[in-house]
Regions:
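N-terminal Rossmann-like NAD(P) cofactor-binding subdomain of oxidoreductases
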Residues: 1-198, 202-205, 229, 234-235, ...
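Charged docking surfaces used in two-component/phosphorelay signaling
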Residues: 184-358
Length: 358
C-alpha cells in the first residue's frame, strides 16, 4: 500500500477524494489537511458550520468511518518524505505556493490550474494521452525534484477531450465548437454560486473557463517530443455557461473532421475506444469509458450522471451537421466532481503506479 496525504480535505472536491480513497486497494490515506482554522480538529467536527451546527457534507454517501475521527493537520507541518504521494484540492493561488514544496520530494496530483500551462507539465487524462506521462521525467530533471506535479484538466475539458480523441484518431479534427451547460457544484461551495443568481436563471459567463478549455484541449490532444508537448493544430471555440443543475456538465459539441465521418462511424469509434481503453483494469476505471445513447432524449444530468459512479462520459444525439465541411455534432455529459475531479485524480494515480512512475 502506498501512503498518501490529502491537502484540502474538507471542501467539495476534498470530500470526493475521501470517498474515492475509501478502502482503496493500492492507496492508504494516512494524513489529511485543511484550512488553518480546522487544524487540530477531528474531521467530523471541522465539517460543522460554526453558526448553525449543520454538517457540511455534500455527498449522498455517508462519511466513511475511517476518516470521521481523523485529526486534521497543518500544511506547514507536512513532511513530504513521509508519503509516497500527495493529492491536493486547492485554489490555484494556494497550489502555486504549496505544491512545489511537496514536489521537491514526492509526486503531487493536483486538481488546480496553477501549473497546467507550463512547458514541462503534462495535463493527463488516463486512457487519452498516457504517452505524455514521460514528460514527468523531464519535469523532474528540469526542476531538480524527486517528485513532480501532475495536474488534472479543467472538468469541462475532460468530457470534451475523451469524446474527441477517438474521432481525431480515425478521422482527424479541424475545428471544434462547444457550448457547455455547467453544474453549480463546479463553482465549489465557497464562495460558489449565489442561489438568487442561479435559480430560474442561466449565467452566460464563467471567468477564464473558455480560455482554459481551448488551451487544454489542444495540449492534451497534442504530440510529445523530448522536452515539451506540441499542441494539436485543431481550432477550438467554446462558450461556457452555468445552469441550475447540481452535478454533471452537459456540452453541445460541433466538430469539423478532416475526413468524412458518418454518425454511425463516430459511434463505432467511440465504442471501440471505450472497449480498448488501456485503463480498463485499474481499480477506479469505469466499465465503459464512453457510453453512447440511442435515445435522443439522453444524456440527462439527473438520470445519467451517477452511471458507473460518475466515471463514464455519456454521449447522445450524434448527428451530421451540414453547416460544416464533414460536420458532426453530439451531446455529452461528464460528472464534474467524479471523472472531472477527485475520482479522476485517483484514476490518474493508479495509471502512474501501473506505469511505475510512482
Amino acid at each position: 500500500m502506498l501512503r498518501v496525504a490529502l491537502v484540502g480535505a474538507t471542501g467539495a472536491v476534498g470530500q470526493q477524494f475521501i470517498l474515492a480513497l475509501n478502502r482503496h486497494p493500492w492507496f492508504e490515506l494516512t494524513h489529511i489537511v485543511s484550512s488553518e482554522r480546522s487544524a487540530g480538529k477531528k474531521y467530523i467536527e471541522a465539517l460543522r458550520d460554526p453558526h448553525s451546527g449543520n454538517l457540511r457534507w455534500h455527498s449522498k454517501e455517508k462519511i466513511p468511518d475511517y476518516i470521521r475521527d481523523a485529526t486534521l493537520g497543518k500544511v506547514e507541518d507536512i513532511n513530504p518524505k513521509s508519503f509516497d504521494l500527495i493529492f491536493t484540492a486547492l485554489e490555484s493561488e494556494e497550489a502555486r505556493m504549496i505544491e512545489p514544496q511537496f514536489a521537491r520530494w514526492v509526486p503531487v496530483i493536483s486538481t488546480a490550474a496553477a501549473f497546467r500551462y507550463e512547458e514541462d507539465v503534462p495535463i493527463l487524462i488516463p486512457g487519452v494521452n498516457d504517452d505524455h506521462v514521460m514528460l514527468l521525467n523531464t519535469q523532474r530533471k528540469n526542476r531538480g525534484w524527486r517528485g513532480f506535479i501532475a495536474p488534472l484538466p479543467n472538468c469541462t475539458t475532460t468530457g470534451l477531450v475523451i469524446t474527441l480523441k477517438p474521432i481525431m484518431d480515425k478521422f482527424g479534427v479541424e475545428m471544434v465548437i462547444m457550448t457547455s451547460l455547467q453544474a453549480v457544484s463546479g463553482a465549489g461551495r465557497s464562495p460558489g454560486v449565489v442561489a438568487l443568481d442561479i435559480l430560474d436563471n442561466v449565467i452566460p459567463y464563467i471567468p477564464k473557463e473558455e480560455e482554459k478549455v481551448q488551451v487544454e484541449t489542444k495540449k492534451i490532444l497534442g504530440t510529445l517530443d523530448s522536452r515539451a508537448i506540441n499542441p494539436a493544430s485543431l481550432k477550438v471555440s467554446c462558450t461556457c455557461t452555468r445552469v441550475p443543475v447540481l452535478d454533471g456538465h452537459t456540452e453541445a459539441v460541433y466538430v469539423s473532421t478532416e475526413r468524412s465521418c458518418e454518425p454511425a462511424e463516430a459511434k463505432e469509434e467511440m465504442l471501440k475506444f471505450s472497449k480498448s481503453a488501456p485503463i480498463r483494469n485499474l481499480p477506479t476505471a469505469p466499465k465503459d469509458f464512453i457510453f453512447v445513447h440511442d435515445d435522443p432524449t439522453r444524456p440527462q444530468p439527473r438520470v445519467d450522471r451517477e452511471i458507473n459512479d460518475g466515471m463514464t462520459t455519456m454521449v447522445g444525439r450524434i448527428r451530421k451537421d451540414t453547416a460544416f465541411n464533414n460536420g458532426l455534432k453530439y451531446i455529452l455529459l461528464s460528472h464534474n466532481e467524479r471523472m472531472g475531479s477527485a475520482k479522476g485524480a485517483v484514476l490518474l494515480a493508479e495509471l502512474l503506479k501501473d506505469r511505475e512512475v510512482l
